[in-house]
Amino acid sequence: MYKKIIFSEFNSASKILKNFLEDKKQIENIQKAAILIAQSFKNEKKVISCGNGGSHCDAVHFSEELTSVYRKKRSGYPAISISDSSYISAVGNDFGYDQIFSRFIQSVGHLGDILLAISTSGNSLNIVRAIEEAKKKKMKVIVLTGNNAGKIKNLSDIEICIPHCGYSDRIQEMHIKIIHILILIIEKEMQKN
């Protein structure tokens, strides 16, 4: 009944993965991002992640895997996602939704920390403001994005961009795979002396 749809969906995802893998710069950027995050942990710094909607879920998942466990038991790593609903509703109400991430970074971000900003379109104003605030704090910025990276293009230290201009779910599927690979490499880097 729906087999054609199922095959079509998997084929579409496969093509996006294939196109991404052909861009060697993106593969290099994943490696650079993982090494940068591991180095920040070794320097007793933290990573702060943020995103909206499905990207918010990815940001939470990223910090959960780092503070808890991925594939093997190990010590937790200092990762925070900007996800507290009371905080988000308070700042959204008092200052505006565009400041929910930047005010958090203003409060807890420090030199040497890292911001992982996730946006499928690259056009969310609250993500742009988060990046700007992180730069003021002399934090390093890594972005996971899609399409053509939108307004956040060239604002980060490391940009990982999924070359897809269709539905955002395809970009999110790639983002979660990238997040898992980042964590895997971070763990390997943290085992080095």
From Swiss-Prot:
Cofactor or coenzyme needed: Zn(2+)
Co-factor note (free text): Binds 1 zinc ion per subunit.
A Pfam family: SIS_2
EC numbers for this chain: 5.3.1.28
Origin superkingdom: Bacteria
GO biological process entries: carbohydrate metabolic process; D-glycero-D-manno-heptose 7-phosphate biosynthetic process
Residue positions binding Zn(2+): 61, 65, 172, 180
Domain SIS: 37-193
Family in the record: Belongs to the SIS family. GmhA subfamily.
NCBIfam families: gmhA, PRK00414.1
Cited function: Catalyzes the isomerization of sedoheptulose 7-phosphate in D-glycero-D-manno-heptose 7-phosphate.
Annotated protein name in UniProt: Phosphoheptose isomerase
UniProt organism field: Buchnera aphidicola subsp. Acyrthosiphon pisum (strain APS)
Gene this protein is translated from: gmhA
